[in-house]
A protein has these predicted regions:
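Short, compositionally biased low-complexity segments enriched in polar/charged residues
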Residues: 1-31, 43, 47, 74
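Subset-of-secretome marker
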Residues: 1-3, 12, 57, 63, ...
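Extracytoplasmic/secreted envelope proteins and their assembly/folding machinery
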Residues: 6-9, 45, 49-53, 93, ...
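Aromatic-anchored, charged helix-turn/loop surface patch used as a conserved interaction hotspot
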Residues: 10, 32-36, 58, 62
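Second-shell loop/turn segments in exported
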Residues: 33-41, 85-89
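Hydrophobic transmembrane alpha-helix bundles
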Residues: 39, 60-65, 97-104
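Short Gly/Thr-rich strand-loop-strand
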Residues: 45-82
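A short, solvent-exposed beta-edge/loop patch
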Residues: 70-104
Length: 104
């Protein structure tokens, strides 16, 4: 996985107003992705959560025809918003949700 720069984060998620953003994306052949965002307000975080949901939907549509075996990861994507923070994780298994749920 590679860390995305600010321009890529904005292109992928439509988020340009985060106080902090860290996004790691796979090479493109797989769907794994993790993103953490921090915002000034809960309203901004809620908006980013909706943008993340749209990102996952778009990825699902792309992978259905490109690499269909990756769709399960997208179907089980974890998107959590707590206060001013948003976390997104696309990976195998339930571990991601269990780990993120401890912090969100």
């Amino acid at each position: 996985m590679n860390q995305a720069d600010a321009a890529t984060v904005e292109k992928l998620y439509g988020v340009s107003n985060a106080k902090e953003a860290v996004v790691y994306i796979s090479s493109g052949a797989t769907a794994e992705e993790i993103a953490l965002f921090s915002f000034e307000t809960q309203e901004e975080a809620k908006q980013a959560e909706e943008l993340a949901e749209a990102r996952i939907r778009e990825q699902r549509e792309s992978f259905e025809s490109y690499v269909p075996e990756e769709v399960k990861k997208l179907d089980n994507a974890v998107i959590l918003q707590s206060g001013n923070e948003v976390a997104v994780c696309v990976a195998d298994g339930k571990a991601a949700k269990e780990i993120l749920s401890k912090y969100f």
